[in-house]
Amino acid sequence: MNKSGYDVNYATQIYEVKATDNSITVYATNQWIGNRGMTLGGPVLEITFTSTLADSIKVTIEHYKGAVKKGPDFTLYEDANFKPVINEKDEYWELVSNKTSVRIGKAGGAWDIKYFYDGKLLTKEGWRTTSYIEEQPWLTDYRMEGTKAERFYAHASTDEPARIREMLNISVGENIYGFGEKFSTFVKNGQTVEVWNNDGGTCSEQTYKSIPFYVSSRNYGVFVNHPENVTFEVASETVSKVAFSVQGERMEYFVMGGKTIADVLGVYTTLTGKPALPPAYTFGLWLTTSFTTNYDEETVSFFIDEMARRDIPLEVFHFDCFWMKEFNWCDFTWDKRMFPDPKAMLARLKEKKIEICVWINPYIAQQSSLFDEGVKNG
């Protein structure tokens, strides 16, 4: 049963397949086409499979290719010279990227997509998985009645009435991990995950480090290449599937295979960028003021001196957000009530061979003078 206000059009029939030297494109109808008249109505999805990096399959689902792509976009390190292998066999089309491959079934034209690594099935799609979802006009009007701020924080920042949804099968005993820093259980099965940043603390499903990427205990990963809101239903809406959806006429995602999860992460970071190696001291012991505790320079000095007295090596001391004055974050100004001479304090800590880390937030509160400066200068 579909939720009231939505029309769901599933990729039902593989109506036509076109192959080039580096891609396979499938045209999927939302119904079985029995005669020419049935081609006159209903959405047709254009799904392209290609590979721009070894052991990754790039999937692009498009309903209307003329939609304006406004950005922003993730920076990806794709290899324009990489060429997958395209095979046509009696039972399926196949695109091979090193040891990872996708097969598009031919049997009767039914929607049948399978992903493999070194011959082992990773995940698949079948009946009622890929879909184009249309929001009925009355619901769009109702949703857009809120203020701009309300729509933004409700994840609905546009009046786009369409949505693309994909669903990939998961097996019995398969566990899903990822989506960035989350404060729910480590295994994400059974959860609805919104990839949308909020300053929600550490005690709820909200998070400030969201990433539209997950890995499976079956040694594959899925990266949804959309920096906007992405909704994941991890064995929650349908217990045997991971569903993910984005607003608009287009979706792009990558399926990555490997022998181990570490291999999958290697493919992912090759695509999205690998972090630099941090300084050696960052691998040592850190000590923090914690979040809402009351602390000042005397408290900090006591903590550090006690670590030395107990012969506990300390590399980094972290000041949480209250190094700044409350309701002023983040203006990069020390709270002089608690830290009257921060320059001298930091010099003393440096003499003790302690590195310093301070917490920052990606906004400036209204009570800070910098807020007025920002308003004045646009």
Q: Which stretches of residues belong to each language-model region?
A:
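Acidic/polar N-terminal loop/beta-strand segments that form early-domain functional surfaces
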Residues: T29, T52, E62-Y64, S216, ...
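A low-complexity, Ser/Thr/Gly/Pro-enriched, surface-exposed linker/loop concept
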Residues: M1-N35, T39-W93
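Flexible loop/turn segments at secondary-structure boundaries
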Residues: N35, G66-V68, T202, Y220, ...
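Aromatic-lined carbohydrate-binding/catalytic grooves of carbohydrate-active enzymes
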Residues: A276-G378
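Generic, ordered loop/turn and secondary-structure boundary motif
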Residues: T75-Y77, G178-G180, S184, N197, ...
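Catalytic and substrate-binding clefts that recognize carbohydrates or anionic sugar/phosphate headgroups
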Residues: N30, T39-G41, K83-A280, T288-F291, ...
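A generic "cationic amphipathic patch" detector
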Residues: S56, I61-E62, K70-P72, H226, ...
